[in-house]
From Swiss-Prot:
Domain SET: 115-226
Biological processes annotated in GO: methylation; negative regulation of cell growth; negative regulation of DNA-templated transcription; positive regulation of DNA-templated transcription; positive regulation of fibroblast apoptotic process; regulation of cell cycle; regulation of MAPK cascade
Protein name, UniProt field: PR domain-containing protein 11
EC annotation from Swiss-Prot or TrEMBL: 2.1.1.-
Protein family according to the UniProt entry: Belongs to the class V-like SAM-binding methyltransferase superfamily.
Matches recorded under InterPro entries: PRDM11_PR/SET, SET_dom, SET_dom_sf, Zinc_finger
Stretches for region Disordered: 371-399, 477-506
Taxonomic lineage from the root: Eukaryota, Metazoa, Chordata, Craniata, Vertebrata
Gene null: resulting phenotype: Mutant mice are born in expected Mendelian ratios and exhibit no apparent phenotype. Mutant embryonic fibroblasts show an increased oncogenic transformation capacity.
Name of the encoding gene: Prdm11
């Protein structure tokens, strides 16, 4: 009796007394034998394990305890049974010995080939092993695989075979060095099951190749992994994964606890937001501006741009306070329903900027009225900007703040309200009271178009402006504002040849208020008056608001839509 058998019996008596495990095997199915010619090995099935008390069976049965799972078995290809020392019917396993060659000799791996086989090297440098003159019987064992044993991460990979040691850890036998390896390194892995004739398995931390069928002369050797070898590696992989996961979770919890102890202030206190530069927002917009579904024009203005317009009007007090500061400006979020007295003060006191200068001029009276705002506590959402223009114009269109901070929003809101009132009158059929005052020209030097081409082309608005207004815009100079020039003729007179007066010549005659309202070109003038504010000088939020107002204007004239940049 061998040492392994004695050790197995000792563990049996110490662990479970007279209770022993009887191992039986199950042969391969006849269909598999017919398909591949000769049967290959089959691993022990759990259903074949039976427990019988107080008796030790004969030589056909293997006696092992349940707790003793590290016993390695040999497999008999003829009986399709596992055994420890020898098969009850066919005796001990048959080994094919290598040709003895000292370690360190060049090309040692090819010289260790057993008799009856040879290593064939192709012209491309690839090597292969084949049987030459004798049939290799089924069940013969080649090996062990020789090479340098190392951990898994140090293995070469292609010529390495994984093994599981006694401590259930991975190791590899690296056969990349031809001076230390043997001929088994040249055996090619089979590409499909029908061409395989060898099965690789592990026994006592060594790798062996077993012939699963007869190998005839001229046939090349092809090896594949045995079923028990693959299951062993798979079970070890699962255990390693679970162990690493449990270990990683414990380490993560420990690191979090240590971090919480080192930085207790992270668990409480307000969140510090990053400081903005150049008026850019670090947060992306959560919606695409072009994906808004078209709705009723009035409802669109009320629901979508109401808060924007209110915030634009109320932001005047914040801007006035910013203009009074000499250092970098701090723009704060203004409450939604705050009183707009400071916005009116900023509008009436004439906050302006010289076109050639970068400094903003604010009268002292306005700065004194805005004094109490400086004592207010700054909100955490405040951010810094270098100038009001950079706060609105330098930012990316896709990274806009939720409200507008451009200095023109107050005047834009006032104009929007006036236009909405006029449109309501047009819609209801009421006539406005004739104005006794001469028309006022809204001077907006910062909205000037030096070339005049952009404004004149945009005022056409896809043909919605009457021909008389179109003539004014094309022939007139950029210094004249469309706010002060109503159309010279009725729409039915705009098609005549002499219907286009010149802005550069004599003054354009005025029309009566009734004629103004009846003129279908009135909607074009309204669009032109409002679109002057959009010549690349206002913030994109205001531009979207004006776009909706223009849609409302066009709806009165036939359902056309506004196309703004």
């Amino acid at each position: 009796m061998t040492e392994n058998m004695k050790e197995c019996l000792a563990h049996t008596k110490a662990a479970v007394g007279d209770m022993v495990t009887v191992v039986k095997t199950e042969v391969c199915s006849p269909l598999r034998d017919q398909e591949y010619g000769q049967p290959c090995s089959r691993r022990l099935e759990p259903s074949s394990m039976e427990v019988e008390p107080k008796k030790l069976k004969g030589k056909r049965d293997l006696i092992v305890t349940k707790s003793f799972q590290q016993v390695d078995f040999w497999f008999c290809e003829s009986c399709q049974e596992y055994f420890v020392d020898e098969c009850p019917n066919h005796g001990p396993p048959v080994f094919v010995s290598d040709t003895p060659v000292p370690v360190g000799i060049p090309d040692r791996a090819a010289l260790t080939i057993p008799q009856g086989m040879e290593v064939v090297k192709d012209a491309g440098g690839e090597s292969d092993v084949r049987c030459i003159n004798e049939v290799i019987p089924k069940g013969h064992i080649f090996g062990p695989y020789e090479g340098q044993i190392s951990t898994q991460d140090k293995s070469a990979g292609f010529f390495s075979w994984l093994i599981v040691d006694k401590n259930n850890r991975y190791k590899s036998i690296d056969g990349s060095d031809e001076t230390k390896a043997n001929w088994m390194r040249y055996v090619v892995i089979s590409r499909e099951e029908r061409e395989q004739n060898l099965l690789a398995f592990q026994h006592s931390e060594r790798i062996y190749f077993r012939a699963c069928r007869d190998i005839r002369p001229g046939e090349r050797l092809r090896v594949w992994y045995s079923e028990d070898y693959m299951k062993r590696l798979h079970s070890m992989s699962q255990e390693t994964i679970h162990r690493n996961l449990a270990r990683g979770e414990k380490r993560l919890q420990r690191e979090k606890a240590e971090q919480a102890l080192e930085n207790p202030e992270d668990l409480r206190g307000p969140t510090q937001f990053p400081v903005l530069k150049q008026g850019r927002s670090p947060y992306k917009r959560s919606f695409d501006e072009g994906d808004i579904h078209p709705q009723a024009k009035k409802k669109k203005i009320d629901l979508i741009f109401k808060d924007v317009l209110e915030a634009s009007l109320e932001s005047g007090n914040v801007e006035a306070r910013q203009l009074a500061l000499s250092t970098s400006l701090v723009i704060r979020k203004v409450p939604k329903y705050q009183d707009d007295d400071y916005g009116r003060a900023a509008l009436t006191q004439g906050i302006c900027r010289t076109p050639g200068e970068g400094d903003w001029k604010v009268p002292q009276r306005v700065a004194k009225e805005l004094g109490p705002l400086e004592d207010e506590e700054e909100e955490p959402t405040s951010f810094k900007a270098d100038s009001p223009a950079e706060a609105s114009l330098a930012s990316d269109p896709h990274e806009l703040p939720t409200t507008s901070f451009c200095p023109n929003c107050i005047r834009l809101k006032k104009k929007v309200r006036e236009l909405q009132a006029e449109l309501d009158m047009l819609k209801s059929g009421k006539l406005p009271e004739p104005s006794l005052l001469p028309p006022q020209v809204l001077e907006l030097p910062e909205f000037s178009d030096p070339a005049g081409k952009f404004l004149r082309m945009r005022l056409l608005l896809k043909g919605r402006v009457c021909s008389a207004t179109r003539a004014h815009c094309v022939e007139g100079g950029p210094e004249r504002s469309a706010l002060s020039q109503p159309p010279a003729r009725r729409p039915e007179e705009c098609n005549s040849a002499e219907a286009a007066p010149s802005w550069g010549g004599s003054p354009v005659p005025q029309v009566t208020e009734a004629g103004w309202l009846e003129d279908r070109g009135r909607e074009g003038i309204a669009c032109a008056n409002l679109y002057i504010l959009l010549v690349n000088k206002i913030c994109p939020i205001c531009r979207r608001a004006v776009c909706c107002v223009l849609d409302l204007v066009f709806s009165l004239g036939g359902g056309a839509h506004c196309c703004l940049p």
